Amino acid sequence: MDAFKLLTRSTKFKAGNSLSSTLPSKGKAENPQLFRDAEAEKLLESNAFGKKRKRTQAAGDSDAEDGNAGDLDFFGSGKRSAASAPSKKDEDGPSEQKDASDSEGDDSMDEVERRTILNSHKIKVTDMRDFEELQPTQPQKEESKKKKKKRKQQEEEPAQTLTKKEQKKARRLFPEPLVSFKQLRTKYNISRRLAENIAEQGFTVPTEVQLGSLPLLLGDQSVPQKSGTEKSTEPDLLVVAPTGSGKTLSFMIPVINKIVRHHHEKPEERGILSVVIAPTKELASQIVNEGRKLALGTGVKITLMKKGMRVVERDDEDDSKDVLDEDDSESLGSEDDEKATAKNSKGKAPVTKSDILVTTPLLLVNALSANRTKPLATLPLVRNVVLDEADVLLDPLFRDQTLDIWRSCTHPELRASLWSATMGSNVEDLAKSTIKERKDTLSETKSYPLLRLVVGLKDSAIPNIKHKLVYAATEQGKLLGLRQLLHPAAASSTDIRLRPPFLIFTQTIPRAVALHSELRYDIPPEAGGSSRIAVLHSELSDGQRSEIMKQFRKGEIWILVTTDLLARGVDFRGINGVVNYDIPNSAAVYVHRVGRTGRAGREGGIAVTYYTKEDIPYVKSIANVIDVSEKLRGTDEEKSVQKWLLDALPDLSKKKKEELKKHGVKARQTQGTKDDKKTRISTKSGYERRQENKKKALISASRNRKSQPKSGADSGSDDDNQGWQGLED
C-alpha cells in the first residue's frame, strides 16, 4: 500500500507528467512544424484563400475556381481545377513538363498570401547586401536639357537618408514558400530519383526552415534580383533555425540536385563539386549517412573525409597517381576502403574521386597543405560550400581553418550557405566581409544576393520542450538530484519525470569520466547494469566513439554522459530529455544542448539544468533563454523561471562572458587543489580515497623502478669481465 496515496486521497493535484504522456521516443510527430498556430489555420480556411484568384489567362479560358475546403493544404495553396489549365495542350511533351509549367504559372501566390504564410510561421527573409546594391540600376534614357538641369540640381542637394526602420522594411523579402515536398518535382523540377528518395524517407510536410530555404536555393522566381543578374540566381544564404528543424535536408537537397544537373550538362567534368564542413566527426558522419539516403541511385557520390586521404593532385608531386573509382568512393568509411588504402600503403594514397566531400576543418586543411608543409592547394571545381554549425566554425577555434578552405575554392560561381541555430552579428559580418573580399580578389563583376533567413526568435530554444532550472546548492546536491531522476520515488505533481534514453552534459572530460564512474552501478543488473551507462568524449579513439554512438542509437545504452562534443548537430530522434549537470558556458551552448531532444516537432522532451552556489553569477543568460522559450510556447502552464528570480539574478559583464565562454566556471577548473573538495564528483569517504591514492602511488613507484637501469651488480659486472689488472701506481 502506498502511504502517500492513502494520505492524499482527498487532495486534487494538477495533472502531472504521467508515464503514458507523449514522449519523443514514442515516434514521429504528426506535424514537424513548430510555429503553426490556430490563427494560421483560421487564415488558411478563410475566404482569403478559398475565393477565386484573378489570373492572366489565354483568350477563351474561364476563371479558375478553387476546390473544396478539404482540398486545401497546410499553406492555402489548394488543388486547382482542370479549368485553370491552358486550353492549348502540348500532347507531344511529357506530362511532367506540363505539371511544372502549370505549377509555375497558376499556383504562384500573390504577395499578400506569401506575407501571411511567412509571418504565421515566423519566417523572416532579409537581404543582407549594402543598401546601395539593393537599388535597381535602370538604363539611362536620352534626356532633354531641362531634365538634365533638374537632375543635376537634385544630385547637388543632400540625399535624403532613410531611417533604420525604413531600411529594414526595404530589405524584407517575401519569397513564395514550399507547400509540400511534391512541389520539388512539379514546380522546381528536381531529379526524379531524388524526389523518389525524399518520398521514401517519409517526408511530406516541410518544416519552417525547409519551407523558406528550399525555394531560395532551388531557384525562386519571386525573389527580386538586382538588374544585370539572372532572375533565378542562387543566393548566398545565412540560415538561423531551431535545433531539430531539418537543416541538413534543407542544404543537401539543393546540393545533390545541382550536382545531378551538372553531371548531365558536363559529364566529362568530374571532381569535388561541393564541400560540407562540420565541427565534429560525429556530425560529419551523420551528414554523410543522411546524404547517401537522398543520393541513392542518382550517381552522386558522398565521401566522409578521413585522415591520410588525398583530395587534389598537386603540381609538386609525382604524376603517377592512382584515382579512386566511383564505386570505391561510395564505400569509403567501410572495410573495403581500408583494404583499398592498405593496397596503396607502399606508395601514396589515391586521389579521392567524389562529388560531395563532408569534412571537419583540420582534416581538409591538412590534406590541402600536405600537413602544413606546403602552400594550400586550390579546389577549382567546388561550386558550393556549406558551413553546418557556422557560428562554431567561424569562432576563433576553427576560424582560420574554415576561412582557408573557403578561400581555396576559386570557382567564380561559388555559392556559400551558413547554417546554425545560433548566429551572432559578428558571424554575419565575417561572412559578409569574406564574400566581398573573395569577390574583389577574383575580380568578379557579377553580383549575387546575400540573404538571411531566420525562423522563430533568433538564438532561442525550441518551444516544444519543458525546461527545469533546479538549484542544488552543492556538488553533492546535484549528484543527489540526478540519482532521484534515475530512481524516482512516489510521483507528485511537481516531480520531474525523465525516462531514458537521455543525455548528461558536463563541463570537462575528467568530470564526465568521474560522473560515469559514480553512476556506473546505479542501474540494477536485471535492467542491464553498467552496460546501460556510457561516457563519450574526444579523448576516446574513433572506433570507440563510433561504437558508443551505434549502441546509443540502437537503444543498448540508455544514459550517455558526455561533454559539448555532442551538443551540436547530432540527431537523436528518440531522446526523451537532456540533463545539464554542469551549466553551459553560454546561452548559445544551452540552446544547442537542449536541442538534442524535441527533434522534428516531437513533444514531451524535458531539459533539466542543475546549478550550485558557485554558478549563480552565470545563470541569468540561461534563465532568459528559458523565459523566452516558454513565452513562445504560449501555454498557461506555470513558468519554471519566475520573474522574481530573473530580477534577483546578477547580470554578467561582457569580459566575464568571454572568460566563461573560453574556460567555463573557474570553480570546476581547480583540480588537485584545496578547492577541489567543493567540486569533486564522488561519494567516497576520505579514508577510501586515501587508500586508493596509496595504491596508485605504489603502482607508479613500481613502474618507475622497473624503468630505471640497475646500479649495483650491473655496474660491477663490467669490471669482473676485464679481470685483475694489477695494483695501481
Curated annotation (Swiss-Prot):
Major location category of this protein: nucleus
Basic and acidic residues bias (residue ranges): 87-101, 686-695
UniProt cross-references to InterPro entries, sorted A to Z: DDX52/Rok1_DEADc, DEAD/DEAH_box_helicase_dom, DEAD_box_RNA_helicase, Helicase_ATP-bd, Helicase_C-like, P-loop_NTPase
The protein, known as: ATP-dependent RNA helicase rok1
Domain notes: The Q motif is unique to and characteristic of the DEAD box family of RNA helicases and controls ATP binding and hydrolysis.
Occurrences of domain Helicase ATP-binding (ranges): 228-441
Compositionally biased intervals (Acidic residues): 314-338, 716-729
EC number: 3.6.4.13
GO cellular component terms, semicolon-separated: cytosol; nucleolus
Domain of life: Eukaryota
Compositional bias per record (Basic residues), positions renumbered to this chain: 696-708
Keywords for this protein: ATP-binding, Helicase, Hydrolase, Nucleotide-binding, Nucleus, Ribosome biogenesis, RNA-binding, rRNA processing
Residue ranges of the motif DEAD box: 388-391
Localization per Swiss-Prot or TrEMBL: Nucleus, Nucleolus
Function, in words: ATP-dependent RNA helicase involved in 40S ribosomal subunit biogenesis. Required for the processing and cleavage of 35S pre-rRNA at sites A0, A1, and A2, leading to mature 18S rRNA.
Domain Helicase C-terminal: start-end pairs: 481-649
Segments for region (Disordered): 15-34, 45-171, 313-350, 657-729
UniProt subunit comment: Interacts with the U3 snoRNA and is associated with the 90S and 40S pre-ribosomes.
GO biological process: maturation of SSU-rRNA
PANTHER family tied to this protein: ATP-DEPENDENT RNA HELICASE RHLE-RELATED (PTHR47959), RNA HELICASE (PTHR47959:SF15)
Positions annotated to bind ATP: 241-248
GO terms assigned for molecular function: ATP binding; ATP hydrolysis activity; RNA binding; RNA helicase activity
KW Aminoacyl-tRNA synthetase (keyword) present: no
Organism: Aspergillus niger (strain ATCC MYA-4892 / CBS 513.88 / FGSC A1513)
